[in-house]
Structure formats: structure tokens, C-alpha cells
């Protein structure tokens, strides 16, 4: 699994609904915006490890973690994190897990975070999303497991 983790001061995800734009996930104030990519050999245990790391990583102000101050997380699936653009002009997605593999693992990350006590908002798996955030720092970290 691969996660791009950004310290934010608020973030939201909007998708196009039947009646226009619909906000499907939002966090207010200090927290983390997490883009999660899944590859073929990822497992529920890797999802659990990632959740524990996200809950405890000290990326917030004063070297605090989300668990220290009950800061929220916005978790968004993003298969393009496993894109490969080394050859040619068009990325390939061979390393990205298909949706039927990836979706339950992203859901597992969210479920594990919530089980740890986290407040978690999410995007909508497979949807075209507009993500808005106020990057704080900026402070961005890549986590792989």
C-alpha cells in the first residue's frame, strides 16, 4: 500500500451527484488528508499497519499525531499512486490493484482507523472527485508498506 499524507487545515471531497455537486467527505481544522493506493499483493494486515501508522504519525503541530489530539483524517482512494510514467508519454497502471481488490482494502484502512478511535471522512471509491484542501506547511509524506 502507498499513501500520500498531507497535513491540512480543512479538506473536502466533492462528486457530481444527480442534483449537482455533492460533498461526500469533509474535515474541518487541523488533520490529515490521505490519498491511498493499493497494489496487487496488499493484504488486510497491510491495511491495518497503514491505519496504525496514520493514527500515530507525528505530522501535526508541535509534533503531535491524530491520536494525540483527536484530529480527523480524510481518506481518499487513488489508484494513480501506482502509475508508472518511466516509459513513453502515457502512464501505465499495471501495478495498481483492480477495483474489486482495492476497494475492500481501502475500506479496511478506514474501518481500522475508526476502530482506533479516529474520526474519518472519505471520498467515493471509483468516482471522479474534486478534492479541496488547505495544505498546512506544506507538510507531505509518502508512506509505503
Swiss-Prot record:
Coiled coil: none annotated. CDD domains: Dtyr_deacylase (cd00563). It catalyses: glycyl-tRNA(Ala) + H2O = tRNA(Ala) + glycine + H(+); a D-aminoacyl-tRNA + H2O = a tRNA + a D-alpha-amino acid + H(+). GO terms for cellular component: cytoplasm. Transmembrane segments: none annotated. A motif (Gly-cisPro motif, important for rejection of L-amino acids) lies at residues 137-138. Its main location: cytoplasm. GO terms for biological process: D-amino acid catabolic process. Gene3D superfamilies: D-tyrosyl-tRNA(Tyr) deacylase. It is found in: Cytoplasm. It is an enzyme of class 3 (hydrolase). One of its GO terms (molecular function) is Gly-tRNA(Ala) deacylase activity. Keywords: Cytoplasm, Hydrolase, RNA-binding, tRNA-binding. It holds the Pfam family Tyr_Deacylase. Its EC number is 3.1.1.96. Disulfide bonds: none annotated. SUPFAM superfamilies: DTD-like. It comes from the Bacteria. Homodimer. HAMAP family: Deacylase_Dtd. Belongs to the DTD family. An aminoacyl-tRNA editing enzyme that deacylates mischarged D-aminoacyl-tRNAs. Also deacylates mischarged glycyl-tRNA(Ala), protecting cells against glycine mischarging by AlaRS. Acts via tRNA-based rather than protein-based catalysis; rejects L-amino acids rather than detecting D-amino acids in the active site. By recycling D-aminoacyl-tRNA to D-amino acids and free tRNA molecules, this enzyme counteracts the toxicity associated with the formation of D-aminoacyl-tRNA entities in vivo and helps enforce protein L-homochirality. A Gly-cisPro motif from one monomer fits into the active site of the other monomer to allow specific chiral rejection of L-amino acids. This is D-aminoacyl-tRNA deacylase. It comes from Streptomyces avermitilis (strain ATCC 31267 / DSM 46492 / JCM 5070 / NBRC 14893 / NCIMB 12804 / NRRL 8165 / MA-4680).
Amino acid at each position: 500500500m502507498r499513501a500520500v499524507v498531507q497535513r491540512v487545515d480543512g479538506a473536502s471531497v466533492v462528486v457530481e451527484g444527480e442534483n449537482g455537486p455533492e460533498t461526500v467527505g469533509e474535515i474541518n481544522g487541523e488533520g490529515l488528508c490521505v490519498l491511498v493506493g493499493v497494489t496487487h499483493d496488499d493484504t488486510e494486515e497491510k491495511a491495518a499497519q497503514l491505519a496504525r501508522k496514520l493514527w500515530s504519525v507525528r505530522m501535526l503541530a508541535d509534533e503531535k499525531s491524530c491520536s494525540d489530539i483527536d484530529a480527523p483524517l480524510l481518506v481518499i482512494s487513488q489508484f494513480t499512486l501506482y502509475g508508472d510514467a518511466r516509459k513513453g508519454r502515457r502512464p501505465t497502471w499495471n501495478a495498481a490493484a483492480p477495483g474489486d481488490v482495492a476497494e475492500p482494502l481501502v475500506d479496511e484502512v478506514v474501518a481500522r482507523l475508526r476502530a482506533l478511535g479516529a474520526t474519518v471522512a472519505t471520498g467515493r471509491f471509483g468516482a471522479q472527485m474534486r478534492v479541496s484542501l488547505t495544505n498546512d506547511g506544506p507538510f507531505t509524506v509518502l508512506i509505503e508498506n
